[in-house]
Regions:
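Short, small-residue-biased leader/transition segments that mark boundaries at the very start
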Residues: 2-9
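Central beta-strand plus flanking loop segment that forms part of the substrate or channel wall
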Residues: 10-17, 207-234
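Dinucleotide-binding Rossmann-like beta1-alpha1 core, especially the glycine-rich loop
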Residues: 11-104, 262, 274, 282-283
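Short beta-strand to alpha-helix junction loop
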Residues: 30-38, 68-75, 122-142, 152, ...
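Helix-loop-beta segment of a Rossmann-like dinucleotide-binding subdomain
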Residues: 54-66, 103-147, 169, 305-309, ...
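C-terminal catalytic lobe of FAD-dependent flavoproteins
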Residues: 120-126, 134, 275-405
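Helical element adjacent to the flavin cofactor pocket in flavoenzyme catalytic cores
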Residues: 120-187, 385-398
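Flavin (primarily FAD) binding-site architecture
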Residues: 190-205
Length: 449
């Protein structure tokens, strides 16, 4: 089962409750804008004929938050009040009405009693489900068909060497034949997911020091009963259990994988030494160096709750996963669900002036050498949904002398480039409408009500 990721409007990690009780939605604005930028680029690829059939990788899907308990209900209502008056989120709906929730999430309401006031939900209909595996294959095929690009599969970069002329010598292994060959280049871009940190360390640049990685597997339970799958049509987030890190927020999602509609619940984190799903059990240990061991130890001391949670997840059986699912879907039957292991993510651990040694970085991190000859993309959530914004950041930070020349072409691909979708409501609505049409998503605009 391929690991799927998407920007979730409902993810409350991006709307943080402040000490005074207010809700800060600034991160939600930023992430939402970045996702709108990604949609523009994908829409351009469709319009220009570089990829086809957007419904093979993106579907419209409501995003919903569902909570129980007085404190959680109050939080969700305060969150709704903070978001509803901002144009990006003004289509948000909120209810504590039992019958209304039965319309939004009928499967999840089966077996529940109407206790009034202990449950609440909020909903935005403009959410999406994105299959990044399908999108990646479409983009790779487009590059493969281009006369200007060579795409090599089953090849692995095994080492780097800085040459006296300033170029980089890249050593590459053909995993089919075992042959190793070399290639010289002026610039290195390392975008290898969980494998990025070991590759960055091989460059030996100073910026690769004092950082490490914490590998986490993702497990999901997937529904195998078509009748159950058809009763749910949303991505629904809950609230993280008390005493657990915010990254543990569970969700029950309608997903489209290889053209088939399915239903997933999770994730359940599972720690292990591999940096990649099919990596080596020595990955983590090989990444521990004299120059980063103090960073890793500091992270362990600072993040005891996360480590405890991860250990608890390792020993969780399918029965434990099903018990967790029943807090969402009380009528869930064991025989209708199957446990799968998805991909890997490697949370970046680094030293910072603001947070000291061993800070776990939640989010993507761009690392570049002082001379900008090495650029590495590290980290995780929000991940793929913001990848286009990250690519633009890489270009702007490392090739500033070219950005003015590139701007017209970038504007053609991403019409909002250089402008703010957060501060310009008219532009935001125009862009949303256009990308909705380009990607065949449908469109709902409160301004037209």
């Amino acid at each position: 089962l391929r690991r799927q990721r998407q920007m979730c409007i409902r993810d409350r990690n991006y709307t943080v409750q402040q000490p005074d009780g207010s809700i800060d939605i600034e991160k939600a604005k930023e992430i939402n804008e970045q996702f709108e930028i990604s949609k523009q680029f994908w829409g351009h690829l469709v319009k220009s004929g570089q990829i086809e059939n957007p419904r093979e990788f993106i579907h419209p899907l409501p995003h919903i938050s569902f909570v129980r308990g007085k404190n959680n209900v109050k939080f969700l209502k305060d969150r709704y009040e903070a978001m509803k008056n901002f144009p990006m989120f003004d289509n948000i709906e909120y209810t504590e009405d039992f019958e209304e929730m039965k319309k939004w999430i009928p499967l999840m309401m089966e077996g529940r009693e109407n206790n009034g006031g202990v449950m609440a939900a909020s909903k935005i209909d403009e959410g999406t489900d994105v299959n990044y595996g399908a999108l990646t294959r479409k983009m790779a095929k487009n590059l493969h068909d281009s006369s200007n690009v060579e795409v090599q599969y089953n090849h692995e970069v095994v080492d780097f060497e800085r040459l006296s002329n300033g170029k980089w010598l890249v050593k590459i292994k053909n995993r089919n034949t075992g042959d190793v060959f070399e290639h010289q280049t002026d610039y290195l871009f390392i975008g290898a997911g969980g494998g990025a940190i070991p590759l960055l360390q091989k460059t030996g640049i100073p910026e690769s020091k004092h950082l490490g990685g914490f590998p986490i597997s993702g497990q999901f339970i997937a529904c195998t009963n078509p009748q159950v799958i058809e009763q749910h049509d949303a991505k629904v987030y809950g609230k993280e259990p008390p005493g657990t890190p915010p990254m543990t927020v569970p969700h029950l999602d309608t997903r489209y994988i290889d053209g088939e509609r399915t239903l997933l619940f999770g994730p359940f984190a599972n720690i292990g030494p591999k940096f990649l799903k099919f990596g080596s059990n020595l990955d983590l240990f090989r990444s521990v160096k004299p120059y980063n061991i103090s960073t890793l130890l500091a992270a362990a001391i600072k993040n005891v709750p996360l480590i405890k949670y991860s250990i608890d997840q390792v020993i969780m059986t399918k029965e434990g996963c099903m018990n967790h699912l029943r807090t969402f879907y009380p009528e869930a039957r064991d025989e209708d669900w199957q446990l799968y292991t998805a991909g890997k993510r490697v949370q970046v651990i680094k030293d910072t002036e603001e947070n000291g040694k061993g800070f776990i970085q939640f989010g993507t991190e761009v690392v570049n050498s002082e001379d900008h000859s090495v650029i590495a993309l590290l980290g995780e959530s929000p991940g793929a949904s913001t990848s286009v914004s990250v690519a633009l950041e890489v270009l702007e930070r490392n090739f500033p002398e070219y950005t003015s020349d590139w701007k017209p072409k970038i504007k053609e691909m991403i019409p909002s480039y250089g402008e703010s979708l957060i501060n310009d409501e008219q532009l935001m609505r125009k862009i949303r409408k256009q990308t909705s049409e380009d990607l065949e998503l449908g469109y709902y605009d409160k301004a037209k009500k």
